[in-house]
Regions:
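Conserved beta-loop-beta element that borders a ligand/cofactor-binding pocket
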Residues: 124, 158-184
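Mid/C-terminal beta-alpha module of Rossmann-like enzyme folds, strongest
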Residues: 204, 230-233, 237-281
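Substrate-binding strand-loop-helix patch
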Residues: 188-194, 215-228, 244-264, 306, ...
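Conserved Rossmann-fold NAD(P)-dependent oxidoreductase catalytic core, especially the SDR/UDP-sugar
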Residues: 77, 105-149
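NAD(P)H-binding glycine-rich loop region in Rossmannoid oxidoreductase-like domains
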Residues: 54-99
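Amphipathic terminal alpha-helices
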Residues: 308-326
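N-terminal Rossmann NAD(P)H-binding glycine-rich loop of SDR-like oxidoreductase domains
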Residues: 3-23
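Glycine/proline-rich active-site loop of Rossmann-fold NAD(P)-dependent oxidoreductases
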Residues: 155, 168, 180-198, 208, ...
Length: 326
């Protein structure tokens, strides 16, 4: 019996693959990209071997072939086209829809034919949209109002996943992630814009200074190891009282708080503050409030293990030990 992880060579997927392999799962990764040296070294430290299969989730025959080659017990569908800039959304509109919707349908059909024990759809806080008040904490009962193609396709895939499960007797669940940071974030074919954590920790690792931006801007960041652990908790739980969970720390972090945390760990790092008129908010406009983690704690007892200092410490250690300086 194996656990299939789509998008297993990407940022979130790579961490899911390693964490599951470290916790008793026989993992098969399915991704349009093969593993690079950085990923091989990262996953190579896992307790169980991982099979990397290269293929396209949009191709139904390639997806169906997985069911012939492996006895698939559980699926974590993390493959996605991440679009967080309107220019890229305009340029790749068809790709976003094909990958995020057709790919999900193909994986659900595989789950149906294999009668998997659990299908997890990895969604995003983007499903809520950004039009909601920034001081409003968003729980799973908050009505989603996504505006861009990324958020729209994530929410649509959630609904498709739920209905497919109802129609075909599958145990399905959606997990909405808040904003991740940590090891294995890098530019890939489906992820082009990096987080401020990636930028600033990279500068520290290279011995460069940091140029600040709009320091009041922020997000509800969560360390990637906590995301992997939270997803495994939902995946392996014998019973799920709900089919939708937020996965988050529930804590809003401003850029100033992140910078303070980095400087505490690397006091020699030089900081430059440009004139206010030149400052640009990291990651673009982002006005939604933090997600609530109450349901995941109440139902399954899950809580995050990493606060900001612990996450930054672990991330900087990985950058140093892996030699990843980009």
């Amino acid at each position: 019996m194996v656990t299939l992880v789509t998008g297993g060579t990407g940022f979130v997927g790579a961490n899911i693959v390693k964490h599951l392999a470290d916790n008793g799962h026989n993992v098969v990764s399915f991704d349009i990209n093969g593993p690079d040296k950085l990923l091989e070294d990262f996953v190579g430290q896992a307790s169980s071997p991982v099979a990397f299969i290269q293929g396209d989730i949009v191709d139904p025959e390639s997806v169906a072939r997985l069911g012939l080659d492996y006895q698939i017990d559980k699926i974590v569908h993390a493959a996605v086209y991440t679009v967080n800039r309107e220019a890229l959304e305009i340029e790749r509109s068809r790709d976003v829809i094909a990958i995020n919707l057709e790919g999900t349908a193909n994986l659900l059909e595989l789950a149906r034919t294999q009668q998997t024990k659990r299908f997890i759809y990895v969604s995003s806080g983007a499903a809520y949209g950004s039009a909601l008040p920034s001081d409003q904490t968003l729980n799973e009962e908050t009505p989603p109002v996504p505006e861009n193609l990324y958020g729209i396709t994530k929410f649509a895939s959630e609904m498709i996943t739920r209905r497919y499960g109802q129609l075909h007797g599958l145990s399905t669940a959606t997990v909405r992630l808040s904003t991740p940071y940590g090891p294995m974030e890098r530019v890939t074919g489906h992820r082009a814009v990096m987080s401020v954590f990636h930028d600033w920790t990279g500068r520290v690792a290279r011995g460069e200074g940091i140029t600040t931006e709009d320091m009041d801007d922020g997000r509800d960041y969560i360390y990637i190891a906590d995301i992997a652990d939270g997803l495994r908790t939902v995946l392996d739980s014998p019973n799920l009282p709900h089919n939708l969970y937020n996965l988050t720390t529930g804590i809003w972090l401003t850029l100033q708080e992140i910078l303070d945390g980095i400087i505490e760990l690397s006091p020699s790092t030089q900081v430059t503050t440009p004139p206010a008129k030149l400052a640009v908010a990291a990651g673009g406009n982002y006005s939604r409030g933090p997600l609530s983690s109450h349901r995941l704690f109440s139902d399954l007892g899950w809580t995050p293990s990493y606060d900001l200092k612990a996450g930054l410490t672990d991330y900087l250690k990985w950058r140093t030990e892996s030699g990843y300086l980009d």
